[in-house]
UniProtKB/Swiss-Prot annotation:
Residues 335-371 form a coiled coil. Residues 1-32 form the signal peptide. This is Glycoprotein 55. Compared to other gammaretroviruses which possess 2 envelope proteins (gp70 and p15E), RSFFV gp55 corresponds to a gp70-p15E fusion protein with a deletion of a portion of p15E. It is encoded by the defective env gene of the virus. Residues 256-281 are annotated as: Disordered.
Length: 408
């Protein structure tokens, strides 16, 4: 039987993008399955580089997660200036030059996000006033959106020349390792802790001079993340070979008074008491949380007035403390965490009942703060639907009458 005259072959009806769409879905699913835990620990290295010389001013490595590995970075202003700077007579080649650099203010402008009119690398992204977001100057430059803040460290202004302690006696005032006496402290802002650091970020730094051109240098900040080792699947603990269910309370039997043996009978050896039942795996985890509570209650008793102790069930295992506050996402603690309510009386095993009780109290408090009109809408869904169903045609009818009146 012949097909319709205008039917296309089957291969023409297949979407050519179909395989790519399926491949993208599979890749996305694979990425979601392999998503790292927020508690995963990495070897994080932060590196500050002088882009004018290519030298590293600071390289700090630490172990931490992707959300908390934001340390303070310490380096020297001379690591960014170099021996000679921008044909201005400034530089850090001599102790006197290093001392003179300490007398100038400086300001920093971002190169990762350059506002209009702030120029390029030649101007250090500081083409006009107002581009600076941080620094150490009398007008106190600051920003609410930049990723870092850069300030001077704690060095006395009246310190003498910055002698190199390896070249002269360390007893000389102002002698430091390498002649470094212009310490800087780089800190991450809240925006910087939330930003993506997949690539390097660039900033320009300029010394403020009352006359002449302010000299320019540029530096970059990069983050390198390395796994601390292969993630080996974790199975049952070989030390704990008796993975038992939670132990049940044993009924205590009152001891019977001993009866004297009949005359002429041999002495009876008393039977040994049966060994006590070992605690199960659940009891051991509860004891772990209870031990954490006791340690917390002894060290920080103010934190245990009203809190939750949570044990993350997925490796690596962590214990945390959550102080009660204004939180609305109550289901987030039910993913991979086992939480127990605690106060000064101790750990509450029946935590879900406590949670339901507190949720009920909060719901009643919320309902008591509502007005009668809002409460009517929340309680009567059919009334809400009826109101909106009637309001629509009424508005249209009123508009028709209004236009009819205006044109008549």
């Amino acid at each position: 039987m012949e097909g319709p005259a205008f039917s296309k072959p089957l291969k023409d009806k297949i979407n050519p993008w179909g395989p790519l769409i399926i491949l993208g879905i599979l890749i996305r699913a694979g990425v979601s399955v392999q998503h790292d835990s927020p508690h995963q620990v990495f070897n994080v290295t932060w590196r500050v580089t002088n882009l004018m010389t290519g030298q590293t001013a600071n390289a700090t490595s630490l172990l931490g997660t992707m959300t908390d590995a934001f340390p303070k970075l310490y380096f020297d202003l001379c690591d960014l200036i170099g021996d000679d700077w921008d044909e201005t007579g400034l530089g850090c080649r001599t102790p006197g030059g290093r001392k003179r650099a300490r007398t100038f203010d400086f300001y920093v402008c971002p190169g990762h996000t350059v506002p209009t009119g702030c120029g390029g690398p030649r101007e250090g992204y500081c083409g006009k006033w107002g581009c600076e977001t941080t620094g150490q100057a009398y007008w106190k430059p600051s920003s609410s959106w930049d990723l870092i803040s850069l300030k001077r460290g704690n060095t006395p202004r009246n310190q003498g020349p910055c002698y190199d302690s390896s070249a002269v006696s360390s007893d000389i005032k102002g002698a430091t390792p390498g002649g470094r006496c212009n310490p800087l402290v780089l800190e991450f802002t809240d925006a910087g802790k939330k930003a993506s650091w997949d690539g390097p970020k660039v900033w320009g730094l300029r010394l403020y001079r009352s006359t002449g051109t302010d000299p320019v240098t540029r530096f970059s900040l990069t983050r390198q993340v390395l796994n601390i080792g292969p993630r080996v699947p974790i199975g049952p603990n070989p030390v704990i070979t008796d993975q038992l269910p939670p132990s049940r309370p044993v009924q205590i039997m009152l001891p019977r008074p001993p009866q004297p043996p009949p005359p002429g009978a041999a002495s009876i050896v008393p039977e040994t008491a049966p060994p006590s039942q070992q605690p199960g795996t659940g009891d051991r985890l509860l004891n772990l949380v209870d031990g954490a509570y006791q340690a917390l209650n002894l060290t920080n008793p103010d934190k245990t007035q009203d809190c939750w102790l949570c044990l993350v069930s997925g490796p690596p295992y962590y214990e945390g403390v959550a102080v009660l506050g204004t939180y609305y996402n109550h289901t987030s603690a039910l993913k991979e965490e086992c939480c127990f309510y605690a106060d000064h009386t101790g750990l509450v095993r029946d935590s879900m009942a406590k949670l339901r009780e507190r949720l009920t109290q909060r719901q009643k408090l919320f309902e008591s703060s509502q007005g009668w009109f809002e409460e009517l809408f929340n309680r009567s869904t059919w009334f809400t639907t009826l109101i909106f169903t009637i309001i629509g045609p009424l508005i249209i009818l009123l508009l028709i009458l209004l236009f009819w009146t205006l044109h008549s």
